Amino acid sequence: WDETFADDGTTIYGNAGGAWTAFKSGGGDDELSAATLVDIRANIVHATSTSAHYADLAERYATDTSVEAGDVVMLGGSEEVTKCNDDLSDAVFGVVSDSPAFLMNATAGNNESHPMIALKGRVFVKVKGTGQAGDRIVSGGNGEARIATLDECTTFNTLGRLIKHKYNEETALTECVIGVK
């Protein structure tokens, strides 16, 4: 709430119960500036977004271990998700995201107790090994992914695909698309 806001006579209020309020400062009809913008504050906004700055769909899940962006997780452990420590895990679930385009279950916990788990879309993943754009990734243990051979891939263990070539063997955050087999 902006405590410095003062009613200059051009303020328009809606629903005194507090469901929404619109503020508008004065200015000419053709004047575009910060002073003429409308600031809407609401309890619930029903709107349609036509674009997003980021490219993954994520949801908050309770975790039983410390995780960070790019970590591969699986369902299970003592909470909902845990870091995936198995190679070629059929329980692989998603990747910890730091900037999802859309976040579901947003009010559940915080990033330590309920990290944002990317379920689909473009996200940076901790990948070890070299690979070409389009190569499939699977869990590689220690919360990392690795490049899979075609004979290793199944519907259950494939996490996604590399978007760009990866030229070094070291584990690095690598742009991938997940949820694509």
Go through the PLM ranges and name each one.
Residues W1-D56:
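Small/polar residue-rich beta-strand/coil "junction" motifs that cap repeat-based extracellular fibers
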Residues D29, L37-K181:
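Extracellular receptor-binding modules and their adjoining Ser/Thr/Gly/Asp/Asn-rich linkers
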